From Swiss-Prot:
Function noted in UniProt: Key component of the proton channel; it plays a direct role in the translocation of protons across the membrane.
Transmembrane segments: 39-59, 97-117, 139-159, 205-225, 239-259
Superkingdom of origin organism: Bacteria
Encoding gene, per UniProt annotation: atpB
Pfam families the record matches: ATP-synt_A
Membrane topology note: Multi-pass membrane protein
Family: Belongs to the ATPase A chain family.
Name of the molecule in the record: ATP synthase subunit a
InterPro entries: ATP_syn_F0_a_bact/chloroplast, ATP_synth_F0_asu, ATP_synth_F0_asu_AS, F0_ATP_A_sf
PROSITE patterns: ATPASE_A
GO MF term set: proton-transporting ATP synthase activity, rotational mechanism
Compartmental location: Cell inner membrane
Biological process annotations from GO: proton motive force-driven plasma membrane ATP synthesis
Amino acid sequence: MYAQPKLTSAEYVQHHMSHWKLNLYNFTFTDGGFWTLNLDTLIISVVLGALFILIFYIVARRATASVPGKWQNAIEMAVEAVDGTVKDSFHGDRSLVAPLALTIFIWVFLMNFMDLVPVDLIPRLFQMGGVEHFKAVPTADPTLTFAMSITVFVLVIFYNFKMKGAIGLGKEVLSRPFGWYLMPINVIFRLIDEGVKPISLALRLFGNLFAGELIFILIALLPWWSQFTLGMVWTLFHLLVITVQAFIFMMLTVVYISLAAESH
């Protein structure tokens, strides 16, 4: 990790916190406000998703019941751990929820893991191709974390309608938690409860990864003789953080869907 000598400390931090942007209104590499697509987030997340699918596909094709290899052992442990977690939290049909939970955990972990890559490495590679700004940690971008949390929110709504029906869900919204006589308050409470879920889910992941990335950038600004020691200490701690955050995102997704799928 090293800082660019031509930039001040503030400029260096700002440079690494800026995205490679595409204006969807006129398709130029400028900031288009709401109509802005962060290309770096899109590229890294898609590449990591494709890598995840490719690795699992290759290991599944080469799987053997006799003497499994290291990759097969690791994937089987991950699958069994996630399936056991889902089984404890979700008591309905797990044919969709278990694969979804596994996908979320592995994909979010891989995106979080990009925070451990030296802060100047990937931006420098893209800079050689003429890209001025490139932010390599997708989960440090709120647009991605909110996109994922909104997708979870849509699944929660789907399971609410699937398990309770429109009439059953309507009765639940109007009558709980204070009974039929306080229907307006019940509706307000329900809207707040459902609205907070995707917001907290997105901000928790974004906040932790954004802070972690910022600390790595600040370490890169320190003298070379202190970068290695502090970088190693923070890397070891942050390895725990990125794993826990991936697990929390997966776990809350399963819990929210489980609550929606419960019929009363």
